Amino acid sequence: MMTPNPDANAAYAKLHVLLVDDDEFLLEIMKVTLRDLGVSSILLAKNGFEGLNTFRQATIRPNLIICDLCMPQLGGMELLSHLALDGCKADILIISGHNLIPPVDNHWALANYNGPILNLAEKIARIQGLKVHASFEKPITREKIIEMLDLVVTFNAPPPAIQASK
């Protein structure tokens, strides 16, 4: 089993994560795993509407959002568009079980796209000014969660101090 590097736990403790996914079982598994890894606060939302409201009403603004793409009511792409309009500065990771085969749902924003959906979603979100670091295909495992957190923590780490030459 993959374990995070010991320095990572201090960095994980600074994360305030918003998980947005319509799969309640996955939300619970991710919440337990994040808590086990030392993440300080975890907010859950079952669809894009809940995610947007949770983000807007949070006492401590999430600094990491992990968002599914295909959800009922308000999907991930629409959620990301609203977050961009709100000026969201959080780090964002996109997850989906529908990377190469879109779901049969004409209401889903990317239902008719013929190609890797995760790559397209990343590009669209970045064009809107969001800080998307990567996307991950489901299933989401403990190892993928550690990879996700390490990616964000490494990106946000201060640059190493440069020692002056003598």
Regions found by a protein language model. Name each.
Residues T59-I66:
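Active-site beta3 strand of CheY-like receiver
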Residues M77-C88, D105-A109, L120-I124:
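Short amphipathic alpha-helix used as the core "switch/output" element in two-component signaling
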Residues M71:
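Receiver (REC) domain active-site loop signature in two-component systems and cognate sites
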Residues A13-R35, I65:
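Conserved acidic segment of CheY-like receiver
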Residues K138:
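A Lys-centered signature of the CheY-like receiver
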Residues M1-L18, E122-K131, T141-K166:
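Non-catalytic signal-transmission and effector/linker regions of two-component phosphorelay proteins
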Residues D68, S96:
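Active-site residues of response regulator receiver
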Residues D22, L44-N53, G76:
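Helix N-cap/capping motif at the beta->alpha junctions
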